[in-house]
Amino acid sequence: MKPTQDSQEKVSIEQQLAVESIRKFLNSKTSYDVLPVSYRLIVLDTSLLVKKSLNVLLQNSIVSAPLWDSKTSRFAGLLTTTDFINVIQYYFSNPDKFELVDKLQLDGLKDIERALGVDQLDTASIHPSRPLFEACLKMLESRSGRIPLIDQDEETHREIVVSVLTQYRILKFVALNCRETHFLKIPIGDLNIITQDNMKSCQMTTPVIDVIQMLTQGRVSSVPIIDENGYLINVYEAYDVLGLIKGGIYNDLSLSVGEALMRRSDDFEGVYTCTKNDKLSTIMDNIRKARVHRFFVVDDVGRLVGVLTLSDILKYILLGSN
């Protein structure tokens, strides 16, 4: 039975009120409120070798780490998978300099990124006592899925790295604490928040170096893998690249995506899908229950039609539809 105009209007009003309520909630909380009672934080010194920092990330199953400059006693940026991908691209384009890779330190990344003409290490940060809404805005502005929380010692005035806040943790915090998410009943296809145009995809036979270029050029964290008929079958993530580097594959990136996935770790979290008819209430419930980083949007038979990222969801909650 088709919904009446009155019922559609009621759903629309309820959704708008729910979004406004969630915004007020985000303004009333600070980043401290989101942090667990106890947690572990790994901070890397900028003098550390890049290959050693890679092992630290992989051994601890993390995708980023704050950097600390011990010479200046200051926060020096956030190391992410993007930085390692930049290293791969640099040595792939400059094979004559490949012998230097084992000597590369983290503070040398800026030279590589400058040579490539790509963004430098992300140095955006926020004080943990600022409103959560403000932290969300800063993440959207820097086009990053995470932001370091930097405090200051009251006596010495030295910076203190408190933690790294992620979009996933914020949205899960909202899903756990805001019952208003149950009123987000408008289908996501009607909200204009799905990325559909110019979305890159690959196939199992696509060379990994081509996918790496898609990741950097599109500034995305994953590329969906489809078959010859457009059906979604898997995803290649930026994190998967780290496993290749650990295996020493810096300059032999002609191997296919299918071959690369054979090296994927067993703790892969899987591919999450939805349709245009799904509602944000359902999406938020999934975020509450599982560690989700994106939803690939498929049609009724499983063909890929778009992607809904955590950034898309956060942007809608903060700023409304596009």
UniProtKB/Swiss-Prot annotation:
- The UniProt record lists the CBS domain at 37-97, 118-181, 194-253, 262-322
Q: Which residues bind ADP 2?
A: T195, S221, S222, T309, L310, S311, D312
Molecular function in Gene Ontology: AMP binding; ATP binding; identical protein binding; protein kinase binding; protein kinase regulator activity; protein serine/threonine kinase activator activity
Q: What happens when the gene is disrupted?
A: Leads to a decrease in the length of G1 with respect to the wild-type strain along with a smaller difference in the cell cycle length of parent and daughter cells.
Q: Where is the signal peptide?
A: none
Compartment(s) where it occurs, according to its Swiss-Prot or TrEMBL record: Nucleus; Cytoplasm
- What's the effect of swapping G145E? Reduces glucose inhibition of SNF1 and leads to resistance to 2-deoxyglucose
| The keyword Nucleotide-binding appears for this protein | yes
Binding sites annotated in the UniProt record for AMP: T195, K200, S221, S222, T309, L310, S311, D312
The Gene Ontology CC terms held by the record are:
cytoplasm; cytosol; nuclear envelope lumen; nucleotide-activated protein kinase complex; nucleus; plasma membrane
Outcome of N251I?
A: Leads to resistance to 2-deoxyglucose
Keywords, in A-Z order: ATP-binding, Carbohydrate metabolism, CBS domain, Cytoplasm, Nucleotide-binding, Nucleus, Repeat, Transcription, Transcription regulation
Q: Which residues bind ATP?
A: T195, K200, S221, S222, T309, L310, S311, D312
Tell me what the record says results from C136Y: Reduces glucose inhibition of SNF1 and leads to resistance to 2-deoxyglucose
What's the reported outcome of changing R291A? Decreases SNF1-activation efficiency
Q: What happens upon changing V63Q?
A: Reduces glucose inhibition of SNF1 and leads to resistance to 2-deoxyglucose
Q: What is the effect of changing H293A?
A: Reduces glucose inhibition of SNF1 and leads to resistance to 2-deoxyglucose
Pfam family of this protein, just one? Answer: CBS
Positions contributing to ADP 1 binding: I42, R146, T166, Q167, Y168, R169, R291, V292, H293
Coiled-coil positions:
none
* Domain commentary: The 4 CBS domains mediate binding to nucleotides. Of the 4 potential nucleotide-binding sites, 2 are occupied, designated as sites 2 and 3 based on the CBS modules that provide the acidic residue for coordination with the 2'- and 3'-hydroxyl groups of the ribose of AMP. Site 3 can bind either AMP, ADP or ATP (AMP, ADP or ATP 2). Site 2 binds specifically ADP (ADP 1) and is likely to be responsible for protection of a conserved threonine in the activation loop of the alpha catalytic subunit through conformational changes induced by binding of ADP.
UniProt lists the family membership as follows:
Belongs to the 5'-AMP-activated protein kinase gamma subunit family.
The annotated subunit structure for this chain is: AMPK is a heterotrimer of an alpha catalytic subunit (SNF1), a beta (SIP1, SIP2 or GAL83) and a gamma non-catalytic subunits (SNF4). Note=Interaction between SNF1 and SNF4 is inhibited by high levels of glucose.
Q: What does this protein do?
A: Adenine nucleotides-binding subunit gamma of AMP-activated protein kinase (AMPK), an energy sensor protein kinase that plays a key role in regulating cellular energy metabolism. In response to reduction of intracellular ATP levels, AMPK activates energy-producing pathways and inhibits energy-consuming processes: inhibits protein, carbohydrate and lipid biosynthesis, as well as cell growth and proliferation. AMPK acts via direct phosphorylation of metabolic enzymes, and by longer-term effects via phosphorylation of transcription regulators.
Q: What else is known?
A: Present with 11700 molecules/cell in log phase SD medium.
What is the name listed in the Swiss-Prot or TrEMBL entry for this protein?
5'-AMP-activated protein kinase subunit gamma
Organism of origin: Saccharomyces cerevisiae (strain ATCC 204508 / S288c) (Baker's yeast)
Q: What is the lineage of its organism?
A: Eukaryota, Fungi, Dikarya, Ascomycota, Saccharomycotina
